[in-house]
Amino acid sequence: MSAIDDLPPLREVIREHQLSARKALGQNFLLDLNLTARIARAAGPLEDATVVEIGPGPGGLTRALLALGARHVIAVEHDERAIPALQAIAERYPGRLEIVCTDARTFDVRPYLGSTKAKIVANLPYNIATHLLIGWLSAEPWPPWYDMMVLMFQREVAERIVARENEEAYGRLGVLANWRCETKILFDISPSAFVPPPKVTSSVVRLVPRTAPEPCDRRALEQVAAAAFGQRRKMLRQSLKSLPTDPARLAAAAGVDPTRRAETIPVSGFVAMARELTNSRDDNKT
């Protein structure tokens, strides 16, 4: 990481560019370059890789990604104040850092990639992290334009992402995430590592897209999961009443006991119910 050593410390960068964290942008800057390097290494070998980073801020993780060999980093930053700091990094790594100043929620990175698969590696702004993740998990067609995500979330959100049936954090997000990806919490980061320190512990999560998830319509899966977890303490025969079909019949046809509750149903059970929901709609059309 010799090239990084030539760049100013991140605290100096923040001071020089007056990058006080803005709560409205969900900013908490990670200044420890050992931790940013650990996050970057969690994405596996970076040599010749294309990496999409959301919310680079002063560029700590950006520097680690480039120093570890990423061929092309696309840094998407909404805060115009951070652009000069990122441009200084780009000068150290000519032709390897592409800076896009825009809102990640409306940004389509695919035209920047062509046929290249990317990795998404980011300390996500907390206020839009779940929104972004759901968008990436909803990508069509599948497999998606990325082959791995290494992302930082609040610990509570990370637990929801990796949760399985019969775990307290299990819900709609866990169903979608684990249907389409293999998920794992890699490590935690203390609030004291950030400026300003958040009130909660953060966790780094790795999501690897499944090549062939169990087949079902994504929208039907989301609809079934939303209904079931909307009244998670009730039996499926009650909680699924908002669906346009008989809930007990739907569950039974999917091989799921309609007296069970959402929190006890594995992802495969939700997939089976989503398929039955799609089938019932098709039957009604004929």
From Swiss-Prot:
Alphabetized PROSITE patterns for the sequence: RRNA_A_DIMETH, SAM_RNA_A_N6_MT
Enzymatic reactions: adenosine(1518)/adenosine(1519) in 16S rRNA + 4 S-adenosyl-L-methionine = N(6)-dimethyladenosine(1518)/N(6)-dimethyladenosine(1519) in 16S rRNA + 4 S-adenosyl-L-homocysteine + 4 H(+)
Pfam family of the protein (one): RrnaAD
GO cellular component annotations of the record: cytosol
Keywords from the named record: Cytoplasm, Methyltransferase, RNA-binding, rRNA processing, S-adenosyl-L-methionine, Transferase
Residues reported in the UniProt entry to bind S-adenosyl-L-methionine: 28, 30, 55, 77, 103, 123
GO MF term set: 16S rRNA (adenine(1518)-N(6)/adenine(1519)-N(6))-dimethyltransferase activity; RNA binding
InterPro entries on file: KsgA/Erm (IPR001737), rRNA_Ade_diMease-like_C (IPR023165), rRNA_Ade_Mease_Trfase_CS (IPR020596), rRNA_Ade_methylase_Trfase_N (IPR020598), rRNA_adenine_dimethylase (IPR011530), SAM-dependent_MTases_sf (IPR029063)
UniProt superkingdom: Bacteria
Compartment annotation: Cytoplasm
EC number: 2.1.1.182
Protein family per UniProt: Belongs to the class I-like SAM-binding methyltransferase superfamily. rRNA adenine N(6)-methyltransferase family. RsmA subfamily.
Role according to the record: Specifically dimethylates two adjacent adenosines (A1518 and A1519) in the loop of a conserved hairpin near the 3'-end of 16S rRNA in the 30S particle. May play a critical role in biogenesis of 30S subunits.
Protein's name in the database: Ribosomal RNA small subunit methyltransferase A
